[in-house]
């Protein structure tokens, strides 16, 4: 696996692979990789002949009081994990390579509606930063397909909409969330948790399961289910940011006749903000 740091080197390497008739897969990351990221690369390797991954901690998607400076940078370990997962090329640019004229004059990509609410409410500008950097990376790599984790459910919806609306010829593949044995979704931010917080953390997924089970039994008072869930989270030591039942495609608030739903949440455990979601498809209407 080669590692390149400039757009020129990246494009030359991808052009060679494409010249050999290879299908290009792409996995953008911010590094500090875990088994969830490895699953994305493995999926890309199954669907493509040449896999490009990127590691770039994107300042444009971090708010003023967020963890940009303390976000872990673990390049050597990340390179080994990518190699084991089947990555062929790593693009690891500096901020100056991605934003040569500075971020203040950078053209932005904004996906309305889907970027609003949920994580967009508590992290204003976040999804504009995500859409902008992913759009730039897509133009740099020009992949046939790209793989994103379903744990970042709203992000995946934003990327799908951007690709559709801007007519990008890229297949977007969602990969199911990878979880620890106790149900906690794998996340780079789990490393911020104290041992006690790590023990409490699986309550987030259990709460989503509780709400989904109620819906599966035919309960349609979503507000009551959410209130129960918020009480569960608070009892487990969380400070809920949001906990909602939404339509899984449009992300609007769920209606009682919707068949495709997502129970989606963000909550703080100490100073660490965890997110998770649970998709459910209802086969038939419940009276």
From Swiss-Prot:
EC numbers: 6.3.2.1
Gene: panC
Gene3D superfamilies: HUPs (3.40.50.620), Pantoate-beta-alanine ligase, C-terminal domain (3.30.1300.10)
Anything else known: The reaction proceeds by a bi uni uni bi ping pong mechanism.
Protein's recorded name: Pantothenate synthetase
Cross-referenced PANTHER family: CYTIDYLATE KINASE/PANTOATE-BETA-ALANINE LIGASE (PTHR21299), PANTOATE--BETA-ALANINE LIGASE (PTHR21299:SF1)
GO cellular component: cytosol
CDD domains reported in the protein's UniProt record: PanC (cd00560)
UniProt binding sites for (R)-pantoate: 61, 155
InterPro entries assigned to the protein according to its UniProt record, in alphabetical order: Pantoate_ligase, Pantoate_ligase_C, Rossmann-like_a/b/a_fold
GO biological process: pantothenate biosynthetic process
Subunit composition and interactions: Homodimer.
Active-site residues per Swiss-Prot or TrEMBL entry: 37 (proton donor)
Originating organism: Pseudomonas putida (strain GB-1)
Coiled-coil intervals: none
Top EC group: ligase
Record bears the keyword Nucleus: no
Locations listed in the record: Cytoplasm
UniProt similarity note: Belongs to the pantothenate synthetase family.
Pathway of action: Cofactor biosynthesis; (R)-pantothenate biosynthesis; (R)-pantothenate from (R)-pantoate and beta-alanine: step 1/1
Keywords: ATP-binding, Cytoplasm, Ligase, Nucleotide-binding, Pantothenate biosynthesis
Catalytic activity: (R)-pantoate + beta-alanine + ATP = (R)-pantothenate + AMP + diphosphate + H(+)
Any matching Pfam family: Pantoate_ligase
Binding site for beta-alanine: 61
GO terms, molecular function: ATP binding; pantoate-beta-alanine ligase activity
Task of the protein: Catalyzes the condensation of pantoate with beta-alanine in an ATP-dependent reaction via a pantoyl-adenylate intermediate.
Binding site for ATP: 30-37, 149-152, 178, 186-189
